[in-house]
Design a protein with these regions (language model features):
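Short, solvent-exposed recognition patches
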Residues: 44-158
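Extracellular/secretory pathway and lumenal proteins
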Residues: 5-6, 103
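Generic detector of short, well-ordered, non-transmembrane alpha-helical segments enriched
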Residues: 42-45, 163
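Low-complexity, compositionally biased segments
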Residues: 35, 40, 95-101, 176-179, ...
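A short, solvent-exposed beta-edge/loop patch
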Residues: 19-21, 111-204
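Hydrophobic alpha-helical transmembrane segments in integral membrane proteins
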Residues: 21-43
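Internal/C-terminal transmembrane anchor helices
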Residues: 6-29
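Short, small-residue-biased leader/transition segments that mark boundaries at the very start
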Residues: 1-3
Length: 204
């Protein structure tokens, strides 16, 4: 056996060792981290009600600090609005079931409404028995809107862009017309069009 034949396995072993060391040494940073320094500013008024801003929980603040993106919450009268803004929807966008159940709510999926934006509807029952309508839509800076997280992620993988989760909370017993009026008021305040739901970045 010639020297070259003897060295070949050794060279291969060295190459694999170098590759392994390189992989181990790479920074442990997730690839789906959103663009940093994203901010969300909710409208000061919606439908005649002034915003009462609600602070994010400490774990929510830590999450957005680590993985980018941003969120803001406010109460308008007897209704609430949560907006999440991200360039990495795979990381940040999800149905409200996960968070609400973690807070002790019983959550039931009730279907999809297209009266305004494509919207997934949930019924959330608080530990004290109070019931709420939780409506969630996802819209992008590219003009897409959907009620489905998977569709939002698929569109993001095709075209990128900034994605927003719009979560509206209202008492469960309101009429559909009242809920639709609330949605339309939010859309007007945030420059969202139902035919081309583009959220103007200047508003955030």
């Amino acid at each position: 056996m010639c020297i070259r034949d003897r060295l070949n396995p050794l060279w291969k072993a060295c190459v694999f060792l170098i590759i392994a060391v390189t992989i181990i040494s790479l920074p442990r940073k997730p690839i789906d981290v959103a663009i940093p320094n994203i901010t969300v500013e909710l409208p000061s008024w919606i439908n005649g009600n002034k915003a009462i801003h609600v602070s994010l929980l400490s774990q929510e603040k830590a999450y957005f600090t680590q993985y980018g993106g941003a969120a803001a919450k406010a109460i308008y009268g007897d209704r609430g609005l949560l907006v999440v803004k991200t360039s990495a929807p795979l990381r940040h966008l999800h149905s409200p079931e996960e968070c609400l159940r973690g807070l002790g709510f019983n959550v039931q999926y009730k279907g999809v409404s297209h009266a305004t934006l494509p919207t997934a509807i949930y019924k959330a029952t608080a530990p004290d028995g109070a019931t709420y309508r939780v409506a969630v839509s996802f819209a992008s800076s590219k003009g897409h809107s959907t009620s489905n997280v998977s569709e939002a992620v698929w569109n993001w993988m095709q075209q990128g862009g900034i994605w927003y989760a719009l979560q509206r909370i209202s008492p469960w017993n309101l009429e559909d017309t009242e809920n639709n009026n609330w949605d339309n008021a939010i859309m007007a305040a945030m420059d969202i069009s139902s035919s081309s739901p583009f959220i103007q970045p200047a508003k955030f």
